[in-house]
Regions:
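Domain-length accessory/inserted modules outside core catalytic folds
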Residues: 1-151, 155-251
Length: 251
């Protein structure tokens, strides 16, 4: 049984009535998501943020208990040995998800510095960033770079939901995912001199802009096709490399 479903039912409240997460609360969320007692396959906060962002943008609402199960890689509640930290972690995640929804619902022309969506990203260790880039035998870049795990979380959410298929095959919609793909791969195979590193922020505006454009694409699609339309086409935003666990070395 998915324990997150029961938790959501017991804590069914309007999370958007809370103020946006403060800097201190965001730091607390980072700390809680880094708890070593979480499952090895649980997502990092970066990856979880990307996953939640894709769920908030996507074709139809993803039930909360399902994306929580995906984030923690288990159907049972995290941190069972510490109920207070468990509740705090889940509450902060719910508020972050509400913040994401609120930010992306504002038209780009009306956004301010305070309302603009910004992805969460952990600080990288300089030694983990290998430049110029090197590839492993599977053709994947080795090491870390800016927003790597955020983009991987977004990719996982898209790959898990067949309803993304209309966008993936649309000649105008699919290119909107280009910044996400670039952040996921860390370099451009067609332009090897361009690569992401720990300090580069040059593509961040393009990434954020693409998220608003994706949100608008799906809004228009729902208006034209309805909110709930089944799709059977297999999504193509999938890499063959396995998911990296929170305690696994970087590929």
């Amino acid at each position: 049984m998915n324990e997150f479903f029961q938790w959501v039912m017991l804590h069914n409240r309007p999370w958007d009535t809370h103020p946006p997460l403060s800097d201190a609360e965001t730091e607390e969320l980072f700390e809680l998501m880094a708890d070593p007692s979480l499952d090895d396959d649980a997502m990092t906060i970066d990856m979880a943020d990307g996953y939640m962002t894709a769920c908030a943008i996507g074709p139809s609402p993803v039930p909360v208990h399902l994306w929580l199960e995906a984030i923690f890689a288990q159907p049972t509640l995290p941190l069972p040995h510490d109920p207070a930290r468990q509740q705090r972690l889940l509450q902060l995640l719910m508020r972050r998800y509400s913040d994401i929804q609120a930010a992306l619902s504002v038209p780009p022309a009306d956004t301010t510095v305070d309302t603009l969506y910004t992805p969460l990203s952990s600080e990288l260790e300089e030694g983990d960033c290998i430049t110029p880039h090197q590839l492993n035998a599977q053709g994947d870049r080795i090491g870390d770079w800016e927003l790597k795990y955020w983009a991987e979380g977004f990719r996982l959410a898209v790959a898990a939901d067949d309803e993304w298929a209309p966008l993936l095959i649309d000649p105008e919609g699919a290119p909107l995912l280009t910044p996400v793909v670039l952040y996921s791969t860390g370099y451009n195979p067609d332009n090897p001199d361009f690569q992401l590193d720990a300090e580069s922020r040059t593509l961040l505006p393009a990434l954020i802009g693409s998220l608003y454009a994706l949100h608008d694409w799906w809004r228009q699609y729902r208006q034209t096709h309805g909110a709930h339309q089944a799709h059977t086409i297999t999504p193509t935003l999938v890499r063959e490399s396995p998911k990296v666990g929170r305690n696994d070395p970087c590929p």
